[in-house]
């Protein structure tokens, strides 16, 4: 298939640049993968889409304030976007400036902090913090929330809360697992009251999630790598859920990719997984774990809309997106959501 097959025209006014007043106030487009049936709902209707005994799997990564502004010793301004924390002092990062820093160059940050350029790895720079503090402490002090480029505004104080799930736990993401942004504590409690089980995986979303696919044929695309973990407790819950005839519902494409990465790495039955994953899911992929998913509306020609098309059917997703645009759903990170059931193989 060609990347252009996943293109669509999106009016600029449908890009959500701010979240709704309440997390659960978004709209929800329901898509049945088998029939292609669509239903326009409010997000709170998710409680009607799930059944007692179903297992909802969330990504508990925490977004770090990964955008830093600084200067080279020569005085030139630069911007740093953390891709990954290597340890307490070192990061891999994208650096935007007029002239790339060289090895041993010092970068001056706000509040007197400094970083040394240690090495270059293709498009990424390895930087080391010159301080007694940890990199996470410095990011929390002087870093900015890494809003996606399509939001097209500076980050604000409110983004520290709203570009973060309420159940975040493990720092490391530089982009939010956005399907989870719609859930508040009351919604999670209501799911529990209904008898829906919950489980948590971790996938530290990288900046590569915003990188455009730069090839014509999807098979030529090289997927970026991200760190993910699926614990044995989660594996056991999935096995119990399936054995009892209930569904595994992934909240977000990152949860889908975590679970399917564990399945890909397992010899037979699903096993625990911890490590880097570069799983690329596109039409033709046979899903091993996930039966339904909650997801936001994705960018044209992105790997995420390819994943959704693999899950619910290429034509079905294309029709659903045309419907969403006509009905003026809000798109991307701060936008509305979908509840999607898998198309039978």
Curated annotation (Swiss-Prot):
Its main location: cytoplasm. GO terms for biological process: queuosine biosynthetic process; tRNA wobble guanine modification. It comes from the Bacteria. Disulfide bonds: none annotated. It is an enzyme of class 2 (transferase). Signal peptide: none annotated. Its EC number is 2.4.99.17. It catalyses: 7-aminomethyl-7-carbaguanosine(34) in tRNA + S-adenosyl-L-methionine = epoxyqueuosine(34) in tRNA + adenine + L-methionine + 2 H(+). One of its GO terms (molecular function) is S-adenosylmethionine:tRNA ribosyltransferase-isomerase activity. The keyword Transferase applies. Gene3D superfamilies: QueA-like. It is found in: Cytoplasm. Keywords: Cytoplasm, Queuosine biosynthesis, S-adenosyl-L-methionine, Transferase. One of its GO terms (cellular component) is cytoplasm. InterPro entries: QueA (IPR003699), QueA_dom1 (IPR042118), QueA_dom2 (IPR042119), QueA_sf (IPR036100). Pathway: tRNA modification; tRNA-queuosine biosynthesis. NCBIfam families: PRK00147.1 (NF001140), queA (TIGR00113). Belongs to the QueA family. Monomer. Transfers and isomerizes the ribose moiety from AdoMet to the 7-aminomethyl group of 7-deazaguanine (preQ1-tRNA) to give epoxyqueuosine (oQ-tRNA). This is S-adenosylmethionine:tRNA ribosyltransferase-isomerase. It comes from Shewanella piezotolerans (strain WP3 / JCM 13877).
């Amino acid at each position: 298939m060609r990347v252009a097959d996943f293109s669509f025209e999106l009016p600029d006014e449908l890009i959500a640049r701010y979240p709704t007043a309440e997390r659960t106030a978004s709209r929800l487009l329901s898509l049945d993968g088998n029939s292609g049936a669509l239903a326009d709902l409010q997000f709170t209707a998710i409680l009607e889409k799930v059944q007692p005994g179903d297992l909802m799997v969330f990504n508990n990564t925490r977004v770090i304030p990964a955008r830093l502004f600084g200067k080279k010793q020569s005085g030139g301004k630069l911007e740093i976007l953390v891709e990954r924390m290597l340890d307490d002092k070192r990061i891999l990062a994208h650096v935007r400036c007029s002239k790339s820093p060289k090895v041993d160059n010092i970068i001056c940050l706000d509040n007197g902090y400094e970083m040394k350029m240690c090495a270059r790895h293709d498009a990424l720079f390895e930087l080391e913090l010159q301080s007694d503090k940890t990199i996470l402490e410095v990011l929390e002090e002087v870093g900015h929330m890494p809003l996606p480029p399509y939001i097209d505004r500076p980050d604000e104080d409110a983004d520290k809360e709203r570009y973060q799930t309420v159940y975040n736990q493990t720092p490391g993401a530089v982009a939010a697992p956005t399907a989870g942004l719609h859930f508040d504590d009351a919604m999670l409690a209501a799911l529990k009251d209904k008898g829906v089980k919950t489980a948590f995986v971790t996938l530290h979303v990288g900046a590569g999630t915003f990188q455009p696919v730069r090839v014509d044929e999807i098979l030529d695309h090289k997927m970026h790598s991200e760190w993910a973990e699926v614990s044995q407790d989660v594996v056991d819950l999935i096995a119990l859920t399936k054995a009892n005839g209930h569904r595994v519902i992934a909240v977000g494409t990152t949860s889908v990719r975590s679970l399917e990465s564990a399945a890909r790495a397992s010899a037979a039955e699903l096993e625990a997984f911890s490590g880097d994953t570069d799983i690329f899911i596109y039409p033709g992929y046979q899903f091993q774990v996930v039966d339904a998913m909650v997801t936001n509306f994705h960018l044209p020609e992105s790997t995420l809309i390819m994943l959704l098309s693999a899950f619910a059917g290429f034509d079905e997703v294309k029709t659903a997106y045309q419907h969403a645009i006509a009905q003026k759903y809000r798109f991307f990170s701060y936008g509305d959501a979908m509840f999607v059931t898998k198309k039978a193989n």
